[in-house]
């Protein structure tokens, strides 16, 4: 394929231009953000500069956009989970497979034994996970507790696989990348927060149409996250786990054409989502009511993830809303992070 001349700017496709789910913020955002942010900061997982950048990312906003109808208790569970995810993400990104495997073992032991105090000399992620789950499980049905533990284990195993890829400098092909990304995105355990007060039976949950809805949602989340995070990831030399880099590598193309590929794939996924939605069976009440609320949550998650990406300072500093309108970005120069944790975006370069 003939490449376009290298440009210092590129455009992020507006993948949700026709997405019918509107932005809705949980009314308990302010109080639950304050509680969860203070709780997270108290663990001292990052140095001062990284903690400041972490706070500006406002992962509590992501939770409160993703769970707009959640009770205060479940809203807090969502906030704590998002903060836990990104503590794990930031720490695991700087280590190889062996260390990340140990991190996974610590976290899963904490999740499976939430009332057991963690050793003082252990990686702090274990205690964060333990406290999160000890509080969150109180508001979760037994079946949703099981699903959370199973899916969180899958998520962490994929993070280990990602570390193994880093160790070997592996660049996956599109198909195998999407397979691992469906787990590293953390969507499956995130969806469990939506069903904490539900008892959706396994036969309903495993229904083929229901699973198609979930898969289309997860894939849209993966693509949506990767297109907004690509710029800072390429700048930090950490873009090997990003669909833009994967498409560029496999199709021997450039950033604009890779973004076009993502946009076309996203449109296809939207069609798959609404086709599955129209084919969803009925099971009678109360199951149909639970399923309706859950499916609304899936569609809303897609909007929430996109909104947070621009409203927070995670990817674009304070220029997020401006970039959300213009869609244009300047390619950030390469930079090596000075410490573990998120880094402030130099928005003067965007």
UniProtKB/Swiss-Prot annotation:
Query: What does the record note about the cofactor?
Result: Mg(2+) and Mn(2+) are more tightly associated with the active site motifs (D(D/E)XX(D/E) and NSE) and thus lead to more efficient removal of PPi.
Look up the record and name the cofactor or cofactors this protein needs: Mg(2+); Mn(2+); Ca(2+); Ni(2+)
Q: Where is this motif: NSE motif?
A: 225-233
User: Site annotated as Plays a critical role in the stabilization of intermediate cation: where?
Assistant: 86
Residues at which Mg(2+) 1 binds: 89
Q: How is its activity regulated?
A: Ca(2+) switches the cyclization mechanism of delta(6)-protoilludene synthase from 1,11 to 1,10 cyclization which leads to the production of beta-elemene.
Q: Which reaction(s) are listed as its catalytic activity?
A: (2E,6E)-farnesyl diphosphate = Delta(6)-protoilludene + diphosphate; (2E,6E)-farnesyl diphosphate = alpha-selinene + diphosphate
Q: Where on this chain does Mg(2+) 3 bind?
A: 225, 229, 233
User: What are the record keywords, sorted?
Assistant: Calcium, Cobalt, Lyase, Magnesium, Manganese, Metal-binding, Nickel
> Which SUPFAM superfamilies does this chain map to?
Terpenoid synthases
Residues annotated as binding (2E,6E)-farnesyl diphosphate? 314-315
Top-level taxon of origin = Eukaryota
Stated family: Belongs to the terpene synthase family.
Q: What is known of its domains?
A: The 2 conserved active-site motifs D(D/E)XX(D/E) and NSE are required for coordinating the divalent metal ions that stabilize the PPi moiety of the substrate.
Instruction: State the protein's purpose.
Output: Terpene cyclase that catalyzes the cyclization of farnesyl diphosphate (FPP) to delta(6)-protoilludene. In presence of Ca(2+), a significant switch from 1,11 to a dual 1,11/1,10 cyclization occurs, producing beta-elemene as the major product, with lower levels of delta(6)-protoilludene and (E)-beta-caryophyllene, and traces of beta-selinene and alpha-selinene.
Please name the PANTHER family in this protein's record: BETA-PINACENE SYNTHASE-RELATED (PTHR35201:SF4), TERPENE SYNTHASE (PTHR35201)
Q: What is this protein called?
A: Delta(6)-protoilludene synthase STEHIDRAFT_64702
Q: Which organism is it from?
A: Stereum hirsutum (strain FP-91666)
């Amino acid at each position: 394929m003939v490449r376009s001349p290298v440009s210092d700017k590129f455009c992020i496709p507006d993948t949700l231009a026709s997405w019918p789910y509107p932005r809705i913020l949980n009314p308990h955002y302010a109080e639950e953000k304050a509680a969860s942010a203070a709780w997270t900061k108290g663990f001292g997982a990052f140095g001062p500069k990284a903690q400041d950048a972490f706070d500006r990312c406002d992962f509590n906003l992501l939770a409160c956009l993703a769970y707009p109808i959640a009770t205060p208790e479940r809203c807090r569970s969502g906030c704590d989970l998002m903060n836990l995810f990104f503590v794990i993400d930031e720490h695991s990104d700087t280590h190889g497979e062996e260390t990340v495997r140990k991190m996974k073992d610590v976290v899963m032991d904490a999740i499976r034994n939430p009332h057991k105090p963690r050793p003082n000399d252990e990686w702090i992620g274990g205690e964060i996970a333990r406290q999160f789950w000890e509080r969150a499980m109180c508001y979760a049905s037994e079946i949703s507790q099981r699903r959370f533990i199973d899916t969180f284990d899958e998520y962490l195993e994929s993070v280990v696989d990602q570390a193994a890829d880093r160790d070997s400098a592996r660049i996956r092909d599109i198909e195998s990348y999407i397979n691992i990304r469906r787990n590293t995105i953390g969507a499956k355990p995130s969806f469990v927060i939506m069903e904490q007060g539900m008892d959706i039976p396994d036969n309903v949950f495993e229904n083929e149409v229901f699973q198609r809805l979930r898969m289309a949602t997860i894939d849209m989340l993966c693509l949506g996250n990767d297109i907004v995070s690509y710029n800072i990831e390429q700048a930090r030399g950490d873009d090997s786990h990003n669909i833009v880099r994967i498409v560029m590598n496999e199709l021997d193309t450039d950033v604009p054409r890779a973004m076009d590929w993502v946009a076309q794939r996203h449109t296809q996924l939207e069609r798959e989502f609404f086709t599955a939605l129209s084919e969803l069976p009925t099971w009678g009440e109360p199951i149909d009511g639970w399923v309706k609320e859950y499916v609304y949550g899936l569609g809303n998650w897609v909007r929430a993830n996109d909104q947070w990406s621009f409203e927070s300072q995670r990817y674009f500093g304070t220029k997020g809303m401006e970039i959300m309108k213009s869609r244009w970005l300047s390619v950030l120069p390469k930079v090596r992070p000075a410490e573990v944790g998120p880094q402030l975006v130099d928005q003067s370069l965007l």
